[in-house]
């Protein structure tokens, strides 16, 4: 169901950035697939035709874990349900009938979610052989990336259908 209080005026963009409140497959499906389906249904019911739909996804759609680098063109073969659900939701966004862009964010960190900082403070060591990498992005950088993409599209710039949001 669509929440009360959603806008009645013209909608120029839809940025779908959800978070599953349950960390098992039905919770992920509810947040990312059913939630997006509901939002797209609302657009159709209201006759809304956004200029673009942005779907905030995850680097979890990639299965690479042997130290290799990935980019937007890397193979997506997720082995876990989280990546599989995100990939399915990405396809829903891409097939929605509007121009769509997937933004695959790495794991968010910020003062509100200090898990990563706590791991470092507690002395967590990362193995060097084979090398292990962690894909992360600060929440402010993630928001700035989305704002940049919106501004670029609004100004008539060309956008790709996929971007990675990862701190350097």
Model-derived features: where do they sit?
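Short-chain dehydrogenase/reductase
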Residues: 29-33, 68-91, 132-137
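Glycine-rich Rossmann NAD(P)(H)-binding loop
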Residues: 128-132, 159-168
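NAD(P)H-binding glycine-rich loop region in Rossmannoid oxidoreductase-like domains
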Residues: 1-42
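Substrate-positioning beta->alpha
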Residues: 85, 115-117, 128-150
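Glycine/proline-rich active-site loop of Rossmann-fold NAD(P)-dependent oxidoreductases
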Residues: 84-87, 96, 109-122, 148-163
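NAD(P)-dependent short-chain dehydrogenase/reductase
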Residues: 80, 94-134
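SDR active-site strand-loop-helix element
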Residues: 17, 53-59, 103-105
